[in-house]
């Protein structure tokens, strides 16, 4: 599969971010392991932001006035067109770092999890309903394990 990732670093402190190749590896794993495994080409934007920007976007698009770890904006092909665009991912660096520390995970493991999690949202996966959450979390765990990471939900299962 040919993957094009437009990585936009829009956070004030770009230190300790994963390498672009890592984001590409995690995103490709999600696409190939998810509902789009037949896809030959995919294109998406990953924007790494600070809390202010994600809070503004969360309020604007979800009417929720607080930060979140990720926002996913899937692209809808117009009728008659089949473009390789998946959409846009917005990931908040500060929230990812805070969650990793709080959950006792390595920063790299949590970046991988958030990259896979948000890409799956672009592919139509969700976790609002219990059955959907189980399906999505199971797939995330499978993909992360295949990439050498531990189950991101292990502490919740204990």
From Swiss-Prot:
Cofactor(s) needed by this chain: Zn(2+)
Predominant cellular place of this UniProt entry's protein: cytoplasm
Key words, A-Z: Cytoplasm, Endonuclease, Hydrolase, Metal-binding, Nuclease, Ribosome biogenesis, rRNA processing, Zinc
Location(s) in or outside the cell: Cytoplasm
Gene Ontology terms: biological process: rRNA processing
Alphabetized GO MF terms: metalloendopeptidase activity; RNA endonuclease activity; zinc ion binding
One Gene Ontology cellular component annotation held by this UniProt entry: cytoplasm
Listed InterPro entries: MetalPrtase_cat_dom_sf_prd, YbeY, YbeY_CS
Cofactor note: Binds 1 zinc ion.
The protein's enzyme class: hydrolase
Binding locations of Zn(2+): 117, 121, 127
EC number(s) given by UniProt: 3.1.-.-
The protein's role, per its UniProt record: Single strand-specific metallo-endoribonuclease involved in late-stage 70S ribosome quality control and in maturation of the 3' terminus of the 16S rRNA.
Family indicated by similarity: Belongs to the endoribonuclease YbeY family.
Protein name according to UniProt: Endoribonuclease YbeY
Native species: Psychromonas ingrahamii (strain DSM 17664 / CCUG 51855 / 37)
This protein's encoding gene: ybeY
């Amino acid at each position: 599969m040919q993957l094009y990732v437009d990585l936009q670093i829009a956070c004030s402190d770009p230190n300790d971010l994963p390498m672009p190749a890592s984001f590409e590896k995690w995103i490709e794993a999600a696409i190939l392991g998810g509902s789009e495994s037949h896809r030959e080409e995919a294109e998406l934007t990953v924007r790494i932001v600070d809390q202010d920007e994600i809070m503004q976007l969360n309020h604007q698009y979800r009417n929720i006035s607080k930060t979140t770890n990720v926002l996913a904006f899937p692209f809808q092909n117009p009728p008659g067109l089949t473009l390789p665009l998946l959409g846009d991912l917005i990931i908040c660096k500060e929230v990812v770092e805070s969650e990793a520390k709080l959950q006792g995970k390595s920063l790299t493991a949590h970046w991988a999890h958030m990259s896979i999690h948000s890409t799956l949202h672009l592919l139509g996966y969700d976790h609002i309903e219990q059955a959907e959450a189980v399906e999505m979390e199971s797939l995330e765990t499978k993909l992360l394990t295949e990439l050498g990471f531990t189950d991101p939900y292990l502490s919740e299962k204990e």
